[in-house]
Amino acid sequence: MQDTLLTLDTPAAVIDLDRMQRNIARMQQRMDAQGVRLRPHVKTSKSVPVAAAQRAAGASGITVSTLKEAEQFFAAGTTDILYAVSMAPHRLPQALQLRRRGCDLKLIVDSVAAAQAIAAFGREQGEAFEVWIEIDTDGHRSGVGADDTPLLLAIGRTLHDGGMRLGGVLTHAGSSYELDTPEALQALAERERAGCVQAAEALRAAGLPCPVVSVGSTPTALAASRLDGVTEVRAGVYVFFDLVMRNIGVCAAEDVALSVLATVIGHQADKGWAIVDAGWMAMSRDRGTARQKQDFGYGQVCDLQGRVMPGFVLTGANQEHGILARADGAAEADIATRFPLGTRLRILPNHACATGAQFPAYQALAADGSVQTWERLHGW
C-alpha cells in the first residue's frame, strides 16, 4: 500500500516535491541568467534523489562537506566533486583512493602547512591533486584574507611547484546569515565577488593558474547584482529553504520544502500547550531564528497540507516532546479543541540542514499525496 501523510509513522522528515522543484528552478534560472555554473552544496540534503533533481535542472558538479558524502555521490554516478572543507592530512589516503577510482575530487586549503602536506603526499603517491585556495571575504570562518597576497602566493607556489594542480579559488560569505535587508545582502554579495576575483587576479599576475573562481551562499547567490569574473556559484540550503532564510528575506514560509510530520500526543490545558512527538531529536537543537527579527522557537506549526498556522510555534522542546503554543506567550483558551489528540501537523524547521540530519531518510511528498522514501546519508 502506498504511504501518505496519514499512514506514516511520526516524526518524519517530509519533502514537499512541488516546493523543492520550484526552489531548484528559481536558483538555476538565476545562475543561468548570470552566466555562471551552479555547483550545489549537497550537505543540505545528503540525498542522491535530491541531487539528481538539481542536476536535471542544469546544475553541474556538486560540493560536499564530508568525504563520506563524496563516496556516496561518486558511487551514484557523480564524478565532479568539490570537498569544501580544509583537508586534514589523515584524510589524504581516502581522497587518493577516490581519485584513483575515477572521481574528479577537488581539495581546498588555506595555509602553507596544508598545501605542503598535500604536495608531499601527492608526490609520494604519484598523484597530482587538484587543489583550490579558500579565500576569506567576510571574516566569517576559514580562508586566506582577500588582501593577504603574500600568503596567497606562498600557498599557490607551494602547490604549483610541488606538482599539484592549482585549480582556483573559492569563498563562502557565511555572514550573510546575519543580514536581513536586500541592500545589505547585495553589498555583501559584491564584497564576496570582488574579494574572490581579486585573489584570482593576484595568482594570475604572479604567473600561477587560476581557472575557477567559486563563490556562494544561498542569500548572496540570490542577492548578487553581478557576478563578473566568477565562474561558478555554490549554494545549498535553497533546495529546501528554512525559517532562517525566511527571516533573511530570500524566501517565504510557503517556499520551505522540508517539514517534520508530527502528531499531537497530549495537552497541558492550563498552560495552553499541546504536546507533539517531535522534540529536539526531530527538529534539532538549532535555534537560529532566536537571533533574528522573528523567533520561531523550534519551528513554525503548519496544518497537514503545509499551510502556516499563524501565531503557533514550537516554543520549547525536550528530547522527544515538542511544546506547541502561541508564539506571543498567551495561553490558548482551548488548546485541546484547537489541536485534538492524534492531530497530524507539519513543522517548518529553523535550519533545514540540521533538521534533515536527524533522520535516516526523507518522505518525498508528491502532488497527489503519495509518499516515497528517499534515503539520506548519515555521519562522516
Curated annotation (Swiss-Prot):
Keywords: Cobalt, Lyase, Manganese, Nickel, Pyridoxal phosphate. Pfam families: Ala_racemase_N, D-ser_dehydrat. It comes from the Bacteria. Coiled coil: none annotated. One of its GO terms (biological process) is D-serine catabolic process. Catalyzes the deamination of D-threo-3-hydroxyaspartate (D-THA). Also exhibits dehydratase activity towards L-threo-3-hydroxyaspartate (L-THA), L-erythro-3-hydroxyaspartate (L-EHA) and D-serine. This is D-threo-3-hydroxyaspartate dehydratase. It comes from Delftia sp. (strain HT23).
